[in-house]
Amino acid sequence: MGLSISKLFQSLFGKREMRILMVGLDAAGKTTILYKLKLGEIVTTIPTIGFNVETVEYRNISFTVWDVGGQDKIRPLWRHYFQNTQGIIFVVDSNDRERISEAHEELQRMLNEDELRDALLLVFANKQDLPNAMNAAEITDKLGLHSLRHRQWYIQATCATSGDGLYEGLEWLSTNLKNQ
């Protein structure tokens, strides 16, 4: 009896854990986003070779966020991070019109992986502060998000340097994690 009450208490008030894989093309802003969420400030970044991992606390959820480098030569390594991933944050440079089709190809390739079949998908349409940035609707179209069947997804316009939109994205992840 005491054990079931403690399990109920844990499910209502306890901290949940969620493993997040944050990927996207190089220079999309993944590392800037990670440290803006973790530290609340902008850090000077260099291209990520390998990964950064940090725990971000939000709404009784402990997000373990794996920020994996996006250069084309190391994208094949992304698959080594797929196991036990509950959520994907795919970061897009909204100002990079020349590589949006490349981002689409990488996203589709990743979503076809069986290990990620149940993972939530959050797309951060980053760099919205730039004057020629594509809006979330245009990125939704160019990434083919409406054609995704049997997958929960959401797109959030963001600006990593100001933090705009980042917590709205985590809010969506936390709400949908609870529904899984």
UniProtKB/Swiss-Prot annotation:
The keyword Nucleotide-binding applies. InterPro entries: Arf1-5-like, P-loop_NTPase, Small_GTP-bd, Small_GTPase_ARF, Small_GTPase_ARF/SAR. It catalyses: GTP + H2O = GDP + phosphate + H(+). It is found in: Golgi apparatus. The keyword Ribonucleoprotein does not apply. GO terms for cellular component: cytoplasm; Golgi apparatus; plasma membrane. A lipid is attached at G2 (N-myristoyl glycine). One of its GO terms (molecular function) is GTP binding. Its EC number is 3.6.5.2. It is an enzyme of class 3 (hydrolase). One of its GO terms (biological process) is vesicle-mediated transport. GTP binds at residues 24-31, 67-71, 126-129. CDD domains: Arf1_5_like. Pfam families: Arf (PF00025). Keywords: ER-Golgi transport, Golgi apparatus, GTP-binding, Hydrolase, Lipoprotein, Myristate, Nucleotide-binding, Protein transport, Transport. GTP-binding protein involved in protein trafficking; may modulate vesicle budding and uncoating within the Golgi apparatus. Belongs to the small GTPase superfamily. Arf family. This is ADP-ribosylation factor 1. It comes from Schizosaccharomyces pombe (strain 972 / ATCC 24843). The gene is arf1.
